[in-house]
Amino acid sequence: MITLMKNTPTLAALFSCVLGSLSAQPPPAAGGSPVNREAAALAEPFVGITTDGKAQPGLFHLRSTGVTTEPVKKAAGAFLAALTPEQRAKTLFPVDDSEWRKWMNVHRYVRQGVSFLEMSEAQRAAAFGLLRASLSAKGLKLSQDIMKLNHTLGELNNNNFTEYGEWLYHITVMGEPSATKPWGWQIDGHHLIINYFVLGDQVVMSPVFVGSEPVIARAGKYQGIAILQEEQSRGLAMVRSLDEGQRKQAILDANKPGNNNYAEGFKDNAVVPRTGLLGANLNAAQRKELLGLVELFVDNMDGGHAQVKMAEVRAHLEQTSFAWVGGSADDSVYYYRIHSPVVLIEFDHQRPANTRHLQKNPQQPIRDHIHVVVRTPNGNDYGKDLLRQHLLAHPH
């Protein structure tokens, strides 16, 4: 018979340790060209982000939110009216088109729709009008700052504005802007992807991908612009608020050698473990801190619909997990994940990609390259579960 010594870890503790270590690292990134990765992703029927490969039913419902989407509809109509017939033809897609799922962060990815680069000043104003109607002032500024920082990246690469630039972003519109029928729009480019689905007065703004390399313009045309600094500091404040027992649950790995996001481009069906510290195990102040952290990301959409989404998040707070990879010093690099049945948020300090030539150690993650992903798990990214319910009720 084997006798365990007093300080020998139990099998359960060992298993928990191993499981935590495994869940700290996402599956290996898909290889191959963007075209091959797109084809492989689209070959999979859409399921959505899940914890086990099966979407949890009954989370999303057709209903009135009481928050108008009329300004978004009008702005989309004005944008489409500003385009030439040729531009409009390549911008419009059916509401259930696979174009929704055709996005990724890689700057060389061939995108559909009309680009800001080919737009006239009046057309750009109409495009930003669509973003302004759909997003909060904070969300609009973040989007425009990301575009400007892509110009900064061009400056850091010998003024290579063919691959990196402020106007290398495309807009597509799925469906016809309507007060009653489903439709939406997408902006897609380097470090900025927003999918915005509308059905009546309901809005689903996900998947969202925002980030930059660099996240601060220290010189050049847009010197002084900085993004995602509050999201960075508030995440750090959250993990620092935890006591020792909570930290053992939340921190999956104190080391961060690479990239950790699960749910970037072509990962619509990613299986993401809900590991970490549950909201049920937070005190009142920590719950408030966690909700405030979620709100930083949700508040990029227009105010009324952000409030609707936050009510949804609060309803599942006890089932919401907070997970951490990396250190918690002032200069640490880290990854954190907030995961509930109705929202997935990932914040990741990434390895340098397009500034490797400027780094002392190009294999180590840096604070100057951040990727953020916001998803609606369990089948409602792109509003797909709402669209499914609508089509069942209103067969076409």
Summary of predicted features, one role per range:
Residues M5, L22-S23:
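Generic N-terminal simple sequence motifs
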Residues I2-A12:
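Bacterial N-terminal signal peptides that target proteins for export
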Residues I2, Q25-P26:
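N-terminal acidic, proline/glycine-rich, low-complexity intrinsically disordered segments
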Residues P26-A81, K90-H396:
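A cross-kingdom marker for long, charged
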Residues T10-S21:
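Bacterial N-terminal signal peptides
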